[in-house]
Amino acid sequence: MGRSSKDKRDAYYRLAKEQGWRARSAFKLLQLNEQFNLFEGAKRVVDLCAAPGSWSQVLSRELLKNIDTSIAADEKPMIVAVDLQPMAPIDGVCTLQLDITHPNTLSIILSHFGNEPADLVVSDGAPDVTGLHDLDEYIQAQILLAAFNLAVCVLKPGGKFVAKIFRGRDVSLLYSQLRLMFRKVSCAKPRSSRASSIESFVVCEDFNPPSNFQPDLTKPLCVIDPTNAHEIAPFIACGDLDGYDADATYPVEINMKKATLDVIQPPTAPPYKRAIELKHSKMMS
């Protein structure tokens, strides 16, 4: 599919480029915030699996848009974005190229907050899907649990955690694990997420770890007496019903039909970069 046809087919894809977002996923976080007020009172925020940076862009624009420039630097909202892949810089965001499963990552993140806990942790991480749904769901669950394990080590009591999930037949077990640490767990589907996709987001509110919980990245989720561990999370649709439908096709204005918009930020180190270079040099057919 060429860029022009995708511009015409996917309203959010084109809208993201028009508004300067690095990816259409920016609208998912915006719609989640409309529903849950995620950014209210957030001063220290962590974006895990952040590349290419659209969620970090949203955090920067929303948290810093009305900030008085005269206030002290340590009183301004602080945003730390973490990913294994390098990221192009974003205003107001500290980008770290780190592994979220490595024990040292925790101390590095906290050092940027002056060793103070975070108010909000978000994660839009997902694997490269294989088409084998059971395998994709399993890998996605492992990414989520890695993000969750780091989140419970950096969050303050009452903090919030948002992460992508693939809803499968065993998703209620995942909700139960999350519910052990948060008083409220919801499953949300932004309008900008295609209805044909099994993608949704868990929104965990009011972080409330057990009294005997000791944060430790080397012992993931080694807590607790799992009493009342069965949990059915409410499913919430987010986004204005008058907005664009992610599964619909919309016409493009006549004067725009031949116009394509460049991406806001090309990938900094894509795995296919060397293959493209070889193809351009005619060394690979």
UniProtKB/Swiss-Prot annotation:
It is an enzyme of class 2 (transferase). Disruption phenotype: Loss of methylation of the 2'-O-ribose of cytidine at position 32 and guanosine at position 34 of the tRNA anticodon loop of tRNA(Phe). Increases occurrence of 1-methylguanosine residue at position 37 in the tRNA anticodon loop of tRNA(Phe) and decreases occurrence of wybutosine at this position. Leads to activation of the general amino acid control (GAAC) response. Slow cell population growth. Abolishes spore germination. It holds the Pfam family FtsJ. It is found in: Cytoplasm. Keywords: Cytoplasm, Methyltransferase, S-adenosyl-L-methionine, Transferase, tRNA processing. The active site is at K164 (proton acceptor). S-adenosyl-L-methionine binds at G53, W55, D83, D99, D124. Coiled coil: none annotated. GO terms for molecular function: S-adenosyl-L-methionine binding; tRNA (cytidine(32)/guanosine(34)-2'-O)-methyltransferase activity; tRNA (guanine) methyltransferase activity; tRNA 2'-O-methyltransferase activity; tRNA methyltransferase activity. Its EC number is 2.1.1.205. Its main location: cytoplasm. GO terms for cellular component: cytoplasm; cytosol; nucleus. It catalyses: cytidine(32)/guanosine(34) in tRNA + 2 S-adenosyl-L-methionine = 2'-O-methylcytidine(32)/2'-O-methylguanosine(34) in tRNA + 2 S-adenosyl-L-homocysteine + 2 H(+). It comes from the Eukaryota. One of its GO terms (biological process) is cytoplasmic translation. Methylates the 2'-O-ribose of nucleotides at positions 32 and 34 of the tRNA anticodon loop of substrate tRNAs. Requires trm732 for methylation of the cytidine at position 32 of the anticodon loop of substrate tRNAs. Requires trm734 for methylation of the nucleotide at position 34 of the anticodon loop of substrate tRNAs. Methylates tRNA(Phe). Belongs to the class I-like SAM-binding methyltransferase superfamily. RNA methyltransferase RlmE family. TRM7 subfamily. This is tRNA (cytidine(32)/guanosine(34)-2'-O)-methyltransferase. The lineage of its organism: Eukaryota, Fungi, Dikarya, Ascomycota, Taphrinomycotina. The gene is trm7.
